[in-house]
């Protein structure tokens, strides 16, 4: 298995990217292609079995227009990595760079799964009862009912493979649990999912997500991104508050020692870097978006996630599911 990694994308590239890559090579039996500017990588990269460096001369920054950047900067680390995936030279591509450019490049060069109108970002969120898949988390700010229905179908397959759940519970994000709640979009989506083969549990509210009420939560990208950032911020604040309180005086420091293992487990469970990145579900090959602020730990886990997606053949399973229920999707449009 070969995974291409964008060495130049993200706030801490290329140092933290390369550190995550080396950790992955130590732990997994895979090959990694590090795509980036060799002049900048030379001080961080050493010869390692399973590692190849592909030199590029350009980088796409976060403030560039996505479509224009991916078309103009053909020798950027992101564009070259996507091209390698398209040609079959690698099995998956991972980047912590410009989200819009990654989506645009994936759509233009690789394309969508037949039957999927819009791909979706699908991060795995930590919850009290395990984990929940959220989609879309920011790719599509304006959606039609069919888009959210398709997100639910893809999320269902992804949960089966990645969370090992036979019949995932599917929830529709809304402002209330009652069927009649919400706007015109959510009301139409409710009917589509309710009348499908999915294990639909109805509407879920913001507080339900953290409790793990649903295995998959579908929503538009505007709402999904707000949920994602809110949960990340809440987890960070709780972690900081715990540290502050436990360092307050000698007594609290002693107490922290006694409950250290428990606290460590809590912090780890709330840490988004443990869950890797967000795949672009709906693209014909595995593309994973890592958080822009990813450090080595997050990159390592995103590579682990990419490896699992390839091993579990997630994309093919989504394709087959869409083919099987194609008539239902067509009828819903």
UniProtKB/Swiss-Prot annotation:
Q: Which cell locations does it reside in?
A: Cytoplasm
For this UniProt record, the keywords arranged alphabetically read as follows: Cytoplasm, Lipid biosynthesis, Lipid metabolism, Phospholipid biosynthesis, Phospholipid metabolism, Transferase
Q: In which pathway does it act?
A: Lipid metabolism; phospholipid metabolism
| Catalyzed reactions | a fatty acyl-[ACP] + phosphate = an acyl phosphate + holo-[ACP]
**Matches recorded under Pfam families:** FA_synthesis
- Which SUPFAM superfamilies is this protein grouped with? Isocitrate/Isopropylmalate dehydrogenase-like
Gene3D superfamilies cross-referenced by the UniProt entry: Isopropylmalate Dehydrogenase (3.40.718.10)
Task: Check the record and name the InterPro entries matching this protein.
Answer: FA_synthesis (IPR003664), Phospholipid_synth_PlsX-like (IPR012281)
**EC number(s) given by UniProt:** 2.3.1.274
Q: Which GO terms describe its biological process?
A: fatty acid biosynthetic process; phospholipid biosynthetic process
Chief location of this protein?
Answer: cytoplasm
Q: What class of enzyme is it?
A: transferase
List, alphabetically, the GO terms of the cellular component aspect: cytoplasm
Has the keyword Calcium been applied to this entry? no
Citing just one GO molecular function, the answer is: phosphate:acyl-[acyl carrier protein] acyltransferase activity
What is the stated purpose of this protein?
Catalyzes the reversible formation of acyl-phosphate (acyl-PO(4)) from acyl-[acyl-carrier-protein] (acyl-ACP). This enzyme utilizes acyl-ACP as fatty acyl donor, but not acyl-CoA.
Please report which protein family the annotation says this sequence is part of: Belongs to the PlsX family.
Quaternary context: Homodimer. Probably interacts with PlsY.
Q: Which NCBIfam families match?
A: plsX
The name on file for this protein is: Phosphate acyltransferase
User: To which species is this protein native?
Assistant: Thermoanaerobacterium thermosaccharolyticum (strain ATCC 7956 / DSM 571 / NCIMB 9385 / NCA 3814 / NCTC 13789 / WDCM 00135 / 2032)
- Read off the lineage from the record: Bacteria, Bacillati, Bacillota, Clostridia, Thermoanaerobacterales
């Amino acid at each position: 298995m070969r995974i291409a990694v964008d060495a130049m994308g993200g706030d801490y590239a290329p140092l933290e990217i390369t550190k995550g890559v080396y950790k992955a090579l130590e732990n997994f039996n895979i090959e990694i292609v590090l795509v980036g500017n060799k002049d900048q990588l030379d001080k961080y990269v050493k010869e390692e079995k399973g590692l190849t460096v592909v030199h590029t001369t350009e980088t796409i920054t976060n403030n560039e227009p996505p479509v224009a950047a991916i078309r103009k900067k053909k020798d950027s680390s992101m564009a070259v990595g996507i091209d390698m995936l398209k040609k079959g030279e690698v099995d998956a591509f991972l980047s912590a760079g410009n989200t819009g450019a990654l989506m645009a490049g994936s759509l233009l060069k690789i394309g969508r799964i037949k039957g999927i109108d819009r791909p979706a970002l699908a991060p795995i969120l930590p919850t009290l009862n395990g984990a929940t898949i959220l989609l879309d988390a920011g790719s599509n700010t304006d959606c039609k009912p069919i888009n959210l229905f398709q997100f639910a179908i893809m999320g269902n397959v992804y949960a089966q493979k990645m969370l090992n759940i036979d019949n995932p519970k599917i929830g529709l994000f809304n402002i209330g649990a009652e069927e009649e709640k919400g706007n015109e979009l959510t009301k139409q989506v409710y009917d589509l999912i309710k009348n499908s083969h999915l294990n639909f549990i109805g509407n879920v509210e913001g507080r339900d997500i953290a409790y793990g009420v649903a295995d998959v939560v579908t929503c538009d990208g505007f709402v999904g991104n707000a949920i994602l950032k809110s949960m990340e911020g809440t987890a960070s604040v709780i972690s900081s508050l715990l540290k502050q309180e436990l360092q307050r005086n000698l007594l609290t420091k002693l107490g922290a020692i006694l409950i250290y293992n428990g606290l460590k487990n809590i912090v780890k469970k709330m840490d988004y870097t443990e869950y890797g990145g967000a795949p672009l579900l709906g693209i014909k090959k595995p593309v994973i978006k890592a958080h822009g602020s990813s450090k080595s730990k997050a990159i390592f886990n995103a590579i682990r996630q990419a490896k699992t997606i390839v091993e579990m053949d997630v994309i093919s399973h989504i394709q087959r599911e869409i083919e099987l229920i194609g008539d239902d999707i067509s009828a819903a449009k």
